[in-house]
Amino acid sequence: MKVLVTGFEPFGGEKINPTERIAKDLDGIKIGDAQVFGRVLPVVFGKAKEVLEKTLEEIKPDIAIHVGLAPGRSAISIERIAVNAIDARIPDNEGKKIEDEPIVPGAPTAYFSTLPIKKIMKKLHERGIPAYISNSAGLYLCNYVMYLSLHHSATKGYPKMSGFIHVPYIPEQIIDKIGKGQVPPSMCYEMELEAVKVAIEVALEELL
């Protein structure tokens, strides 16, 4: 079995992105009999698609779990659905701000995650990790990557399972925000990393 985990480079003025660390820390490890491949995607429309599709074609993973940062969220959020739309609130890392455009013209309006999202949430709760099912992955790069991965599954037959998980800020990202209005929530990096490992374990159990 092969599992792909993707994260993103920093964006929106942030110096770090915990999902970049997650992808790098999981790259090369084994969970059960599965080999994990971690890759970091650019926060750039077009380029992210190129890197993602090339990675999927090279690795041909059985499972793809894409991870993104969701500033303001206080728990692990497991995304239910990706929609065929881009409506960026902020520019990407090359200054492009795409609004009201489809991700794949003529493709389905939306795809549901093929990960066992309720089982993942239940297992996270058992491990003491706060998590919930989210019904919106936004309309930026996270939804973009989730949609493209599921579209690849639908048209190419792999990965067999694909979905997206959002994580909150980590504490070190909050320091420079203190004294500048309401301090956003955060979660320790170790818990976020463990959450992704749990998601992999549950997905693997579902496929076996």
Curated annotation (Swiss-Prot):
What function does the entry list? Answer: Removes 5-oxoproline from various penultimate amino acid residues except L-proline.
Task: Give yes or no: UniProt keyword Transferase.
Answer: no
Q: A GO biological process this protein is involved in?
A: proteolysis
| Pfam families xrefs | Peptidase_C15
Q: Read off the PROSITE patterns from this record.
A: PYRASE_CYS (PS01334), PYRASE_GLU (PS01333)
Q: Which CDD domains match?
A: Peptidase_C15 (cd00501)
Query: What is the name attached to this protein's record?
Result: Pyrrolidone-carboxylate peptidase
Q: Which family does it belong to?
A: Belongs to the peptidase C15 family.
A single GO molecular-function term is: pyroglutamyl-peptidase activity
Source organism per UniProt: Pyrococcus furiosus (strain ATCC 43587 / DSM 3638 / JCM 8422 / Vc1)
EC number from the UniProt entry: 3.4.19.3
Cellular component, GO annotation: cytosol
**Where found, per UniProt?**
Cytoplasm
Database matches in SUPFAM superfamilies: Pyrrolidone carboxyl peptidase (pyroglutamate aminopeptidase)
State the reactions this protein catalyses. Answer: Release of an N-terminal pyroglutamyl group from a polypeptide, the second amino acid generally not being Pro
Q: Which UniProt keywords apply?
A: Cytoplasm, Disulfide bond, Hydrolase, Protease, Thiol protease
Quote the subunit structure annotation: Homotetramer made of two disulfide-linked dimers.
* Primary site of residence: cytoplasm
Q: Which InterPro entries does this UniProt record tie to the protein? A: Peptidase_C15, Peptidase_C15-like, Peptidase_C15-like_sf, PGP-I_bact-type, PGPEP1_Cys_AS, PGPEP1_Glu_AS
Catalytic residue positions: E79, C142, H166
